[in-house]
Structure formats: structure tokens, C-alpha cells
Amino acid sequence: MAMGSASCISLVVLVALATAASGQLSSTFYDTSCPRALVAIKSGVAAAVSSDPRMGASLLRLHFHDCFGCDASVLLTGMEQNAGPNVGSLRGFGVIDNIKTQLESVCKQTVSCADILTVAARDSVVALGGPSWTVPLGRRDSTTASASLANSDLPGPSSSRSQLEAAFLKKNLNTVDMVALSGAHTIGKAQCSNFRTRIYGGDTNINTAFATSLKANCPQSGGNTNLANLDTMTPNAFDNAYYTNLLSQKGLLHSDQVLFNNETTDNTVRNFASNAAAFSSAFTTAMIKMGNIAPLTGTQGQIRLSCSKVNS
């Protein structure tokens, strides 16, 4: 996870460094050093998603929570994993570890955990019927992680639109990027504790029948980890139904529905709801931008032997 800037000057420097670093990434990075890398990642993801369709959303979320600074810091045991937005909810570590073990057996200390996670996120979307995109490669792995930075950088389920925009802008992602990346909630589930307030009177911008249906598995007390689909229409398909849900006030999280609530983002939501191709194009563009946030390249960081711990 990349560190936030302390001043306008440092922000300019960080953006410049991030741009320079992303320029060192290349889609052909492993063509010679580990030519089967992408095939191995795709195979590992396909098997995992076939066994558990929810795993696709979990890997995509894992990438998002790492890629407010794409350095595989979120994969390190403890620290960042214990941050509020992550604790008890991140999944997919075993899938990444298995892929890493396979790659280490054929390409010793060559393919970074950061790249594995970035490619796995893309392959998860594809496995669930979503669009594909070319992933620039060559990231290296961090040797540290920070729970405090995760707490301060990652938006939460109760975030307002302005809070979401501020969090994304901090990472050089614009409002369209924000709305497009939120569309990842077309797959996956959320815990009751993250939407309880919304369905029990905390929000007025919610479909009454939708709220009632959610209460059956999310009581006012207890059941914090009970799950509900983020997209009730097509929960295991990566499509644009998320935005259709928002038009009907059926966004599961407060941070979902604020994107369509007499806000400046309303027209973008309408566009994505009616035009799947527009959503796919914006989503892939935003994913590439997010994957290029402050990567470690060259001699920075390391190539971990195990994704869960730094090299000894």
C-alpha cells in the first residue's frame, strides 16, 4: 500500500515517481524469464473460481486492497491484513500461495507476488464472464506493510460520495474510474455488519422490499458475518447489473447507493446501466490505472520466495 503525501509538493513528487515506475512495466516482462507465468496464473485462478465462484470476487477485492499501492503488501501475514477494512474479510491468500509455489518450481524467484495478484484479478473477471485487458508486468514485492495506511487510504462501506471521490483522487483516479471500479460489486458478497445500518433505517434511499428481504439473514443484533450478494440479479456473473440495481435503489452498501442519489455521478451510473460496453471499457481502463499505482520496479523491494513473508 502506497503512502499518502504530506503536502502538495510531495504529492507531485509521488505522482511523478509513480508515473516513472509504471513506465518501467511491460506486458512482455516474463516472456523470456518465465514464459509460462501467465498460463500458470490463469489455470490456478480458473480452478479456484470453478470450485468456488465467490473466489473470483475475493481475488479482485484482494487486488483492490493491495493496489492503493500495488506491492503485495496485503499478502504479508499480519500488519495490513489486520487493518479495519481487511480484518476478517479478505480471502484468496491460499490461491495466490498455490500459484506462487507452482511458479517457484519452474521459475525460481522470478515472478513477483504483486504481479501474480494483479494478473489473478484480471483472470478472475474473465472467468466470470467479464472483459479482459493487457496487464503491464514487472512489479516487485514490498518488504513492509502498514495497517495504519490501509485504515487511512481504503474507502469503507459507509463512505459518502465525497469521501469516495477524495480517496480515489488521492490515488490519481478520477470520478469515472471510481464509478467503474465500484462496478466490481457486480460479484461477491458483503457481511451483515457492513449493511445493517442501511437496512434498518439508516438510509432512506433503499427499496423497501429489498431492505425487508435482507433482514431475514441480517438481524438487528448478531449475525455480523452473515453474507448477502452485492448483486442480487446475477451474483456470479461479471456484468453491468450492479448499476441497474442502483437505479432501483437496490445497492447493498451505503457506499454503493451514494453513486446514484441525486449526485454528480448519476449520469455515469445511468450510462453504465444501459451500455455494458461503456462499463467494460471504463472498467478495464480504471483497472490498468489502479494496477499502476506506485509499483516497486527495478531494484526496489524484492521478489518474495513466499507471498506471506519477506525473504530472510
Curated annotation (Swiss-Prot):
Q: Where does Ca(2+) 2 bind?
A: T186, D231, T234, D239
- Gene Ontology biological process terms, A to Z: hydrogen peroxide catabolic process; response to oxidative stress
* Coiled-coil ranges per UniProt: none
| Intrachain disulfide bonds | C34-C107, C67-C70, C113-C307, C192-C218
Q: Which GO terms describe its molecular function?
A: heme binding; lactoperoxidase activity; metal ion binding
Q: Which InterPro entries match?
A: Haem_peroxidase, Haem_peroxidase_sf, Peroxidase_pln, Peroxidases_AS, Peroxidases_heam-ligand_BS, Secretory_peroxidase
UniProt function note? Removal of H(2)O(2), oxidation of toxic reductants, biosynthesis and degradation of lignin, suberization, auxin catabolism, response to environmental stresses such as wounding, pathogen attack and oxidative stress. These functions might be dependent on each isozyme/isoform in each plant tissue. Involved in defense response to powdery meldew fungus.
Protein name as it appears in the record? Peroxidase
State the organism of origin: Triticum aestivum (Wheat)
